[in-house]
């Protein structure tokens, strides 16, 4: 069957649209230093995510799911470049169709070598030569940009995880805001409170949140890069720091590091909101305090009890501090929960629901202190900071 030349030109026009769409996605994703909406990369992310949800849907063990989900980001990157190259292949094949003698299969056979192998094509005519040269150039540029993109991703990932690892050393893991305050005051049993280090901590995490907001909205696959340890997550780490700032501002308004804590909170909930919107979630810019939060007053009391175990100084009564804590947490809870659920972050205390509803929150791990007795045997003893809180 001979396809009319007019129909071939219509197909060529469709090919131009495919090439332009794919090129726009490549430029927006790999070159433009800001979050650029691309339906192609968004659909690839949704498709890969759906596959991983299907694979992990019946995996009950969180550690096993974490091992599977560790490959999620890499799969997104591979499928992303595959989608671009396939669209270029189909697009240039349709563009070539009016210039070749034969059917559409001949056009595909001519366009393929131009994209995959430099100089492997034999053009017939000036128009065909120009099309194949452009196809070859675009194929090389796309692969080169994707390769150059990887060091940028891993540099941002390493900066992010450096902050998470330092927080784990201070607060344990999975991270929890009250635990951060308790351990900071307890100071590893030194007898000298290190609460005076909180201003520096909040200043560091203000910068950390700003860096993550910029990098993770510009390079969205970073959101799905998981921490090296299964019980660590950048989402729960930031949530922990924000909860600790909200707690200390609510409980100790006169002695808290007000400016660093407020700036950290502002940078933190802006980070959560920006990343959540980049992922496609509809989160309010200014949440209504009357919405309430998922943390109950009883769980808030459990947190205060945890602080009292280590004699953390508290100025206000719980019933007076509670409204202020709610007012702070409502700013970031919805966005944080949306991201945590989407990436299946470790179910830390106060970090919201996950897809697997039967999964219980995991309290921070607190190893016992081992001391050698006179008989040479180790006798584990619990520190005040090593008691387990209520898993609210």
PLM regions and their residue ranges:
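N-terminal signal-anchor transmembrane alpha helix
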Residues: 10-31, 92
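Short, strongly hydrophobic alpha-helical membrane anchors
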Residues: 1-9
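Pore domain of cation channels
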Residues: 18-22, 77-162, 243
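Membrane-interface amphipathic/juxtamembrane segments adjacent to transmembrane helices
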Residues: 30-59, 159-175
């Amino acid at each position: 069957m001979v396809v009319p030349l007019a129909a071939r030109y219509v197909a060529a026009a469709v090919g131009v649209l495919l090439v332009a769409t794919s090129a726009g996605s490549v430029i927006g994703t790999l070159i433009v230093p800001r979050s650029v909406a691309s339906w192609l990369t968004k659909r690839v992310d949704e498709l890969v995510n759906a596959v991983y949800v299907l694979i992990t849907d019946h995996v009950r063990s969180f550690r096993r799911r974490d091992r599977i989900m560790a490959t999620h980001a890499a799969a997104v990157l591979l499928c992303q470049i595959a989608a671009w190259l396939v669209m270029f292949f189909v697009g240039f094949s349709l563009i070539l169709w009016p210039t070749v003698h034969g059917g559409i299969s001949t056009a595909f056979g001519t366009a393929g070598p131009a994209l995959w192998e430099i100089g492997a094509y034999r053009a017939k005519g000036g128009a065909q030569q120009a099309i194949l040269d452009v196809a070859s150039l675009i194929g090389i540029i796309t692969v080169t940009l994707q390769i150059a993109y990887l060091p940028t991703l891993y540099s941002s990932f390493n900066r992010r995880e450096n902050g998470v690892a330092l927080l784990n050393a201070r607060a344990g893991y999975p991270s929890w805001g009250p635990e951060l305050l308790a351990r900071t005051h307890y100071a590893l049993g030194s007898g000298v409170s290190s609460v005076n280090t909180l201003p520096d901590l909040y200043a560091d995490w203000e910068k950390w949140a700003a860096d993550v907001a910029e990098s993770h909205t510009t390079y969205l696959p970073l959101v799905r890069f998981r921490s090296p340890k299964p019980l660590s997550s950048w989402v729960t780490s930031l949530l922990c720091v924000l909860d600790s700032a909200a707690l200390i501002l609510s409980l100790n308004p006169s002695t808290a590091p007000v400016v660093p804590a407020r700036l950290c909170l502002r940078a933190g909930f802006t980070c959560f909101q920006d990343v959540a919107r980049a992922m496609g979630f509809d989160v309010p810019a200014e949440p209504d305090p009357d919405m309430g939060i998922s943390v109950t007053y009883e769980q808030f009391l459990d947190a205060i009890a945890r602080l009292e175990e280590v004699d953390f100084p508290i100025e206000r009564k719980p019933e007076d501090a509670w409204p202020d804590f709610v007012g702070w947490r409502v700013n970031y809870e919805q966005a944080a929960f949306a991201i945590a659920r989407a990436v299946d972050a470790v179910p830390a205390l106060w970090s919201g629901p996950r897809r697997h509803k039967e999964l219980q929150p995991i309290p921070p791990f607190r190893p016992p202190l081992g001391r050698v007795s006179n008989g040479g045997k180790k006798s584990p003893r619990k520190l005040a900071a090593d008691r387990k809180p209520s898993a609210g």
